[in-house]
Amino acid sequence: MQITREKWSKNFSEWFDWVLREGEFYDYGRYPIKGMGVWMPYGFKLRQNIIGIIRNFLDSTGHEEVLFPLLIPEDLLRRESTHIKGFEEEVFWVTKGGSTDLDVKLALRPTSEVAITTMENLWLKSYKQLPKKYYQIVSVFRYETKATRPMIRLREITTFKEAHTVHETYDDAQKQVEEAIEIYKKIFDTLTIPYVLSERPEWDRFAGALHTYAFDTIMPDGRAMQIGTVHHLGQNFSKALDFKIQKKDGSLDYPHQTSYGISDRAVASVIAIHGDDHGPVLPPSVAPIKVVVIPIPAKNEEETQQVMKYSIEICEMFNKNNITCLTDQDTEKTPGEKFYIWEIKGVPIRLEIGPRELISGTVFIKRRDNFKSYTVRKEEAINKIKELLNEIQEDLRRKAWEDLKSRIEYSNDIEKAKKILGNNSGIVEVPWCGSNECGLKIEELTNARVLGYPIEKREVNDKCVICKMNAKTVLRIAKTY
Amino acid sequence: MQITREKWSKNFSEWFDWVLREGEFYDYGRYPIKGMGVWMPYGFKLRQNIIGIIRNFLDSTGHEEVLFPLLIPEDLLRRESTHIKGFEEEVFWVTKGGSTDLDVKLALRPTSEVAITTMENLWLKSYKQLPKKYYQIVSVFRYETKATRPMIRLREITTFKEAHTVHETYDDAQKQVEEAIEIYKKIFDTLTIPYVLSERPEWDRFAGALHTYAFDTIMPDGRAMQIGTVHHLGQNFSKALDFKIQKKDGSLDYPHQTSYGISDRAVASVIAIHGDDHGPVLPPSVAPIKVVVIPIPAKNEEETQQVMKYSIEICEMFNKNNITCLTDQDTEKTPGEKFYIWEIKGVPIRLEIGPRELISGTVFIKRRDNFKSYTVRKEEAINKIKELLNEIQEDLRRKAWEDLKSRIEYSNDIEKAKKILGNNSGIVEVPWCGSNECGLKIEELTNARVLGYPIEKREVNDKCVICKMNAKTVLRIAKTY
């Protein structure tokens, strides 16, 4: 079968809406509040599997899950002044309880630094308790005035994993930043999402952070999308909330903090990145159903029933071996209609089982990613499927990385950079002297957004694309979500 | 060791606050918004285990998990008039986004009937899709004006499992009510929470329901607490939202719905019900840590280290056998201090491992519930612990049921009933003619709350405690949370 990526790349926005709706992942645009969608059962399971992976990586590195209230009083949110400035125009406010006006406005959490630091101030007294790493997975709210998009730009972000850590020293917090980056790399690798890691420029840091490191991926339409951020908060929040701990030397001081987040966009990326014109291809690591069995009707009813029985038997065999399998037993749909449905749900492997397979005791296997097919004996099916699931997982990751890398170009000519970005072809790296002035000028001239610069040292034997001084590194620019 | 239940029964409220704080389950009263608490890591794990049990029972009976937006527009919430009347004074309203006044006020969901029915109206068209059973586990909000209590009466209920089902006929919905009741019985049995099941009287139904069935348990102070409700909604919401489906006979009609909920109170009950003056006793089915190992220091450092090594080895053996175990390796606390800590965390089994156990290759086991102790050889430890965990689980359930049953009294004398309730001794059943008038009079005269009447037929050869007509059933009354 021919694999095309026309709709997927040329009309990604329509493709994505179509997949979310027809694949029954997420109902968007019909709930009567702008920017808020509904996770349908199939999408919810995908989301749960992704959350499961995030939880495993965090739990196994000493992070402890907690759950804080949704609401933050206005006076508390205002304690860190840069922070509130960054969020002020995006906060939803609760002002009434029943018919009573509240004395203090309550914010729907846009993020939880101040809420969590408030309680850390009560819980943590000594360096002996550090490092401390909390996280929660919650809804956060942003009163977005830009155009909203399902899973990508929402007013209710329903899957915000936010980690918050506390350390004795600046360097300890920096080490935590590095650990967080390593954890995120593993999470995105497991999710088969390729990424570019950059330090965000000074003018685009998280409100209240000393440093912001960000993971961006490239979506099918060539736009970059931020999928994870890691912030070194220094003592900004501990000072604002007067949170001190006893240090090793006996003195009292403000601890250093970090925070890092991953959102619904992780789910959006998993659905989008490996897609084709048939729909998404879900990586086996998170696919809610790994194998779907489509029984192919025979010429007579009796044989059709035997095929169904054989199909169910095969499927049970997979489930017993922890390979989540479902047999589509609908008798009103044709096999072709079922192929369409399960392709748009992105199930990685399909089995087609008809009279031929029944008689020969075989199964006919089709991979969703490249539509290659295999026929194996029933007894060999478990091993073959396990092998194919591993292959699919690796192939998806490898191809997505190749695709991402092919979309990063270097240019020392600002006009050429602008032209590349105009073609929606991903990320352009331009040589940069390191000054904010030149950085902002680059954004202005390309009408694009600066993602930042590599965190590792980058040798650039070139001149800054703006001021023509010696370049210290490259600045990455892209059209973004 | 002597087991006392003085603090637990006489000053339950203080006992509960003490356990939540010292056991590090839930930080309450210190977050700067009334009625909103913080789930700390240990409490969060307990909550997750309880949610896991709820999910298993729902998933295995064809319920599908979804996630709806937190906010409900005012006009939508007003569509079912009885419903909004019931909740109107308890709703938190979002009225501003940034500095902009919103055109339509948005409610923080108090419950989700109207939100979910709105989308069901788009998703469900035919009887062939029915029955449909959705559920979500979310925060709901009530602007409580009564005194709030941790986990029991909150302004943010963070663990609201709400199921919503759709059926072709009234009878199908009634069957679903029965299924829901059976599921809840299994959930509460697994959680070792005893209950009384009643149909709530007409004047205390869920706002918008035709029938409300409720599970109440009795807390240590003798007050009844509602821990689960099941509602037959009839066509009230489908009519209000103009939600029709095609029936088997081809006609279009409003489907019948049910909804049922369990909240944070399930966690509160698990912590409260089996407690004693040392703290709670968590049932093994949900305890985050099933076995804690306390190494007992020896006279010299070398032997102490060997004890520690042996302790860790034992603990790893349990973990490998899926018995969650933790060794308390803190070298600054005495064994006695550790006993105190892990008792207040309710860990069902403690091992004390010292030089004697090291030399003899044994483990010393102590049950948290009755403080009985056992010494077994290391090789027998796994089996012994498994056996004890089962015994503890069964003993907790059995004793809690005995305790509950001993707190239900029958009285055909309203003055005596009032006196019993004044002593906080649980639930009183009084003979009742079935009229609302007499029911309300009973509430008034006893200064207590009517829980309702048994759902099964109850033979009562007695006269109504108010009107002296022949009693049709009993009415249950209690001081309640």
Curated annotation (Swiss-Prot), chains A, B:
GO terms under biological process: prolyl-tRNA aminoacylation
Record remark on domains: Consists of three domains: the N-terminal catalytic domain, the anticodon-binding domain and the C-terminal extension.
Gene3D superfamilies: Anticodon-binding domain (3.40.50.800), Bira Bifunctional Protein, Domain 2 (3.30.930.10), C-terminal domain of ProRS (3.30.110.30)
Function: Catalyzes the attachment of proline to tRNA(Pro) in a two-step reaction: proline is first activated by ATP to form Pro-AMP and then transferred to the acceptor end of tRNA(Pro).
The protein's name in its UniProt record: Proline--tRNA ligase
Main localization, broad class: cytoplasm
Family to which this protein belongs: Belongs to the class-II aminoacyl-tRNA synthetase family. ProS type 3 subfamily.
PROSITE patterns: AA_TRNA_LIGASE_II
